[in-house]
């Protein structure tokens, strides 16, 4: 009954289908890295990617390949991560509106929390209490007991959460002290709001920043807070005095990331200006430029294996993550070669990172070709690639070639309606199918490069074929299953089921392709790999999630209707023929011009009445076929079809004529005339 109710709910909301074209193993961060967590016990670094993937890396420098594993379940940017339970559990927050709980050692997702209604931007962790807070653009803060979260199972899946309300704007930063007695949020409201998480009581509001508050830190006992803002300043606040006690103007632009040593005496800051400084909180004039990154700094993570910290890991809007050594920082400071005037250029402590976790390229530009099947892309390394949307794969790497030239080179005078949309947000190609236009594009099998067993050239619906391929492994889509009795006999005899038809009969997509069912507007309902839809749990969730418009084509095999195009057919002015009564004709938008020419020849010009009479009295099929072939040949020899006074190619279809030649509102008008001999 519950499943039935949920199916109804899915029916009421508008559900889209998306899939990602990618390699099975995406080893490298394909986009900027939003968050970092270091596990010193296992020498592992966790990176949270804008490509939706959390990756685990070894920070042992003797390892040639630092990649360990990927943690994949999110469908949009992962904005923040925290390691809990001495590194056993990882909590992640994403723009897909979910918070996920992971087994950090084994790398699998244990549960998903769906309380947020918009992007989840920040997490905070109280180590002594195993308490995590999440916050985001929905202005809500939720508190989670980590021990409760890790105990969740398929049957015990109810979790209670406390919430902190009162934020008036989107939250971008969050901090909680280790004892779990104070929580602070920063937002586009430009103020810091402070609560007691034990009672959910609002304690205070701190004013001073003039722009979004992007980074927050609290000391252990929750008496002092550091904030970094897009206004370019770092502020130190006394929560006891409820005021700002120091302002540090270290950066030329917005401050987006902060770290502080355990003693809360030195702050490490980075942001839009790409520079990373260490500032002595007790003597603000003393600040050391540690390094300069190649892109704006998004997050930093101190290596706390010793005191003072020996190194700092830095993530930026680029996909590479760097480790910078802090070894000489005290000598550097003692020498007096520090920055006491941030307008003067100074030499950074480090010019080269000590360790580099190499990133991959991100797709930044794409062009959908006229056939509405292939896409050209350009990435951050200026490499151009050619992709097949229908088969969900890369066809060819073209290298560093001119993008516009490649587009021109592949232009074809053919029009196919739009039937999908493309998103590059994760740095990979995400294709989305929507009920409103998914079935708009029909092509002939021959034009699509597919052959039929019977040699015919059927019309194929691109969106329909793709949906059938994406759900090929879902048993509910399989055709002609044996009845249970036969199935049992077969099972006993060990025979394979050969009668079941899967997929679309023309092509398959790579089995590792991620398929995402989500609400229009972003909330993900279900993500799975194409090959996993045969699993019992996945199959059950698909029953609850797949919308009716997808069921119609994949399960019920109801093909959508052909698109019709209305048009008028008139003699050309140069023919001297009398204008016909203006009858509005209608045909499939894929009808070729040659078929209209045949219609003109046979029904209007009617050049050879005798031949027609003879043929019509002959009912034998060979005669009919000859007649058809004769008319086709004669029509092309004797008839010309024009649109806007341009002679049409017989191979062109009506939708292409309308799009490229008619180019105006109202119904398409075609003119015919006899060729001059």
UniProtKB/Swiss-Prot annotation:
Highest taxon in the source lineage: Eukaryota
Database matches in Pfam families: DUF3337, WD40
Name of encoding gene: WDR48
Record's protein name: WD repeat-containing protein 48
UniProt keyword annotations, A-Z: Acetylation, Cytoplasm, DNA damage, DNA repair, DNA-binding, Endosome, Lysosome, Nucleus, Phosphoprotein, Repeat, Ubl conjugation pathway, WD repeat
Function field: Regulator of deubiquitinating complexes, which acts as a strong activator of USP1, USP12 and USP46. Enhances the USP1-mediated deubiquitination of FANCD2; USP1 being almost inactive by itself. Activates deubiquitination by increasing the catalytic turnover without increasing the affinity of deubiquitinating enzymes for the substrate. Also activates deubiquitinating activity of complexes containing USP12. Docks at the distal end of the USP12 fingers domain and induces a cascade of structural changes leading to the activation of the enzyme.
Residues the record lists as N6-acetyllysine modifications: 214, 578
InterPro entries reported in the protein's UniProt record: G-protein_beta_WD-40_rep, WD40/YVTN_repeat-like_dom_sf, WD40_repeat_CS, WD40_repeat_dom_sf, WD40_rpt, WDR48, WDR48/Bun107
Gene source species: Pongo abelii (Sumatran orangutan)
UniProt similarity note: Belongs to the WD repeat WDR48 family.
Annotated compartments: Nucleus; Cytoplasm; Lysosome; Late endosome
Subunit structure: Interacts with USP46. Interacts with USP1. Interacts with USP12. Component of the USP12-WDR20-WDR48 deubiquitinating complex. Component of the USP12-DMWD-WDR48 deubiquitinating complex. Interacts with PHLPP1. Interacts with RAD51AP1; the interaction is direct and promotes formation of a trimeric complex with RAD51 via RAD51AP1. Interacts with ATAD5; the interaction regulates USP1-mediated PCNA deubiquitination. Interacts with RAD51; the interaction is enhanced under replication stress.
Residue ranges, compositional bias (Low complexity): 609-620
Positions of post-translational Phosphotyrosine modification: 28
Disulfide bonds: none
WD repeats: 28-67, 73-112, 115-154, 166-205, 208-247, 250-289, 292-334, 358-452
Region (Disordered): 607-628
């Amino acid at each position: 009954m519950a499943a039935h109710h949920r199916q109804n709910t899915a029916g009421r909301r508008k559900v889209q289908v998306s899939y990602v074209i990618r390699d099975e193993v995406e080893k490298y961060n394909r986009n900027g890295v939003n968050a970092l967590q270091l596990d010193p016990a296992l020498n592992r670094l966790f990176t949270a990617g804008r490509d939706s993937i959390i990756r685990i890396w070894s920070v042992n420098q003797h390892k040639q390949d630092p990649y360990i594993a990927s943690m994949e379940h999110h469908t949009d940017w992962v904005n923040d991560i925290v390691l809990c339970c001495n590194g056993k559990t990882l909590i992640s927050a994403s723009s897909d509106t979910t918070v996920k709980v992971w087994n950090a050692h084994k790398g699998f997702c244990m549960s998903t929390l769906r309380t947020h209604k918009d992007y989840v931007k920040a997490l905070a962790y109280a180590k002594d209490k195993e308490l995590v807070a999440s916050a985001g653009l929905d202005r809500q803060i939720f508190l989670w007991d980590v021990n409760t979260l890790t105990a969740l199972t398929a049957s015990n899946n109810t979790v209670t959460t406390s919430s902190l309300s009162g934020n008036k704007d989107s939250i971008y930063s969050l901090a909680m002290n280790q004892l779990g007695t104070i929580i602070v949020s920063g937002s586009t409201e430009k103020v810091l709001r402070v609560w007691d998480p034990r009672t959910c009581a609002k304690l205070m509001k701190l004013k001073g920043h003039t722009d979004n508050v992007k980074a927050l830190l609290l000391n252990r006992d929750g008496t002092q807070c550091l904030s970094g803002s897009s206004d370019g300043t770092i502020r130190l606040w006394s929560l006891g005095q409820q005021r700002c006690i120091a302002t540090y103007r270290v950066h030329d632009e917005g401050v987006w990331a902060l770290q502080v040593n355990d003693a809360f005496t030195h702050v490490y800051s980075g942001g839009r200006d790409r520079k990373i400084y260490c500032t002595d909180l007790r003597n603000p004039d003393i600040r050391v430029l540690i390094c300069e990154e190649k892109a704006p700094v998004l997050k930093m993570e101190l290596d706390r294996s010793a005191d003072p910290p020996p190194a700092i890991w830095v993530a930026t809007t680029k996909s590479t993550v760097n480790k910078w050594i802090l070894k000489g920082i005290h000598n550097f400071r003692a020498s007096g070669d520090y920055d006491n005037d941030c307008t003067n250029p100074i030499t950074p402590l480090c010019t080269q990172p000590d360790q580099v976790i190499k990133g991959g390229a991100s797709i930044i530009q794409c062009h959908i070709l006229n056939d509405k099947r292939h896409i050209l892309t350009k990435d951050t390394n200026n490499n151009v690639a050619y992709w097949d949307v229908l088969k969900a794969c890369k066809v060819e790497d073209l290298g560093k070639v001119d993008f516009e030239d490649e587009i021109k080179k592949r232009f074809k005078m053919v029009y196919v309606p739009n039937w999908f949309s493309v998103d590059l947000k994760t740095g990979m190609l995400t294709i989305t199918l929507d009920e409103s236009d998914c079935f708009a594009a029909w092509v002939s099998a021959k034009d699509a490069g597919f052959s039929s067993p019977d040699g015919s050239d059927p019309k194929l619906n691109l969106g329909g074929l793709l949906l059938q391929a994406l759900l090929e492994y879902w048993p509910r889509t399989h055709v002609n299953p044996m009845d249970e009795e036969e199935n049992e006999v077969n099972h006993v005899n060990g025979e394979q089921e050969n009668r079941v038809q899967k997929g679309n009969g023309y092509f398959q997509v790579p089995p590792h392709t991620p398929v995402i069912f989500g609400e229009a507007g972003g909330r993900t309902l279900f993500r799975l790999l194409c090959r996993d839809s045969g699993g019992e749990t996945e199959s059950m969730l698909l029953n609850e999630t797949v919308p009716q418009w997808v069921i119609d084509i994949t399960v019920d095999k109801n093909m959508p209707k052909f698109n019709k195009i209305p048009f008028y057919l008139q003699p050309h002015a140069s023919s001297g023929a009398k204008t016909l009564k203006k009858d509005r004709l209608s045909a499939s938008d894929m009808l070729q011009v040659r078929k209209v020419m045949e219609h003109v020849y046979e029904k209007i010009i009617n050049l050879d009445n005798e031949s027609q009479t003879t043929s019509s009295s002959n009912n034998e099929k060979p005669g009919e076929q000859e007649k058809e072939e004769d008319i086709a040949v004669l029509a092309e020899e004797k008839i010309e079809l024009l649109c806007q006074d341009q002679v049409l190619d017989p191979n062109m279809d009506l939708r292409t004529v309308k799009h490229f030649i008619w180019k105006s509102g109202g119904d398409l008008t075609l003119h015919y005339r006899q060729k001059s001999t």
